[in-house]
């Protein structure tokens, strides 16, 4: 587990107005502003759809050099420990019988369409409701950071400084003509 990766994920959810509780690499998230009628995100959740989630248990997997192929998922069953096991009791207490999503934050899915489909199938079979990739999550956090605002969080402050000095490429404007 990388504490830096967990902190980035915490800040992403906090920037999107979630309440966040942490227990090592497991986060419990609650979005009191979520509307039931807004729908739900797909399995691969883009950062701009994260606010559709009301409650969630999030496991941060910071194996940044790996893509989550079927082989990786099958060789590492501990990835799915948070779905069952000792966390069940904590989840029931935290969400008081309300529905919640089981979400993995992972570096990447396979590039190959067949491997991607197989990986998603395995994760669904193991009880995962959605995944967020680190590139999407980090881009979403950077979008929320204001270059001229000071942040108490060291993660956000580092991102703010990098954004201020234009280390991140601005999105290209698309003109209507």
PLM features per residue range, with description:
Residues 38-48:
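Short acidic loop-to-beta-strand element that houses the catalytic metal-binding Asp/Glu
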Residues 147-177:
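Charged phosphate-binding loop/patch that engages nucleotide di/tri-phosphates or the phosphate backbone
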Residues 55-57, 63-64, 144-157:
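Short secondary-structure transition/capping segments
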